[in-house]
Amino acid sequence: SEMCIRDRFHTVLQPISTELNQWMNADFEYNIKYPEQRIHKSASGLMVRSKSEALIATLLSHNRIPFRYECALCLGETTLHPDFTLRHPKTGAFYYWEHFGLMDFPSYRKNVFSKLQLYTAHNIIPSIQLITTYETSEHPFDSAYAEQLIHYYFGD
C-alpha cells in the first residue's frame, strides 16, 4: 500500500514539476531598460541590478524555487517588471518578490507605495502573493531573513 501512495503522489507531482521546468526555461518578456545596471552576478550566473537581488536569486536557486527575474506583468493598463516572479514548487501558484533597496530616498519611497497600490488594486496582496523586502543605509539587506521568508512561503 505504501507503493500505491508513492505512485499516486508521484503522478500528482510530475506534471507540475514538468510545467515548472518548462516555465523556467521558456523565453519571456523581461525588462529591457538600463541593461548596463545589471552588474551583480548571482551564484547561478544571473546578472541582476543589486547585491541584494543577487543574494535573493542565489537563495531561490539554492532552495529550488522556480523564478524569473524582471518578467513582465500586465496589471490593467500598466506593465510592471517585478524583481522576481516565482512559482510554488508544489502547487505552481504564482508569487512576486519586490526588493525595495533605496528606501532612504523620498522619491523612491513614493514610487514604492504607488507600486504597492497597483499590486493591491489587482488583488496581489503584500504578505499573501507579494513578498516584499526593504533596505536603507542603516538597515541593510538581511539574507537570513530572506531565507526565513523562502521557508515560510515555500516550505523546506
Give the predicted meaning of each segment.
Residues H81, T85-K115:
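Short beta-strand-loop-alpha-helix junction that forms the active-site gateway
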Residues Y30-S44:
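A short, surface-exposed helix-loop junction/capping segment
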Residues M3-I5:
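Short, small-residue-biased leader/transition segments that mark boundaries at the very start
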